[in-house]
Amino acid sequence: MSSTVRFAENAGMNEIPNFPLRVVDGLALPLEYRKALRPGEEWKDTTGHLRQLPRYFYEVPSWDSAMKIELSPNFLLWEFIQVDVREAPPLRTFPRYVPCAITLLAVCLERFREAVGTLVHISANGGYRSPSHRFSKNATPHAWGTAANIYRIGDTYLDSRSAIERFSLIARQTLPGIWTRPYGTPTGYAEDHLHLDLGYVLSVPRDVQS
């Protein structure tokens, strides 16, 4: 093996990660958190297919930390974890735990923001929410940290067919593989926000041993 190849394989292996949050194995968390997060368990989606829930999470120590940590140049962590009393009690206080795939969602939303050229606002309960959240009836990418409900873009509120369909088209043209809910009132549709998701993505950090 050439020295160039060895260097390429080893480059960065000893670098200190610059992301400030600690990675935790959900199976090692206290019981109250394991019950709420259900790490690694299977959960049926609306079609009856089994989806495996995330096992690895970032530990968020405080709301102050969430207000300061950038997931991308224009999105802070707090924007993805706004929940209310519908979330399970252990997950309404700190420390909080968010699936590691949340960083992938932030990168996609950053690209979407570049495409629309203005601020993108995530709804309360519209970012990450646990499988124990009252909105979580079936497996939803929100519980994987890979879905966001956008209620406003710039000065435009997404509460009409024209607005939702306009920005849905931009999202699909900008983000390969993104899924958006169609406009409407039946289950599986959206009439007051733009739903974007990457599907059921599991993220296992590189330094995880198991």
Q: What spans do the regions from the language model cover?
A:
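Extended, low-complexity, intrinsically disordered C-terminal regulatory tails
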Residues: 104-137
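Catalytic cores and adjacent binding grooves of peptidoglycan-active enzymes
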Residues: 4-18, 139-210
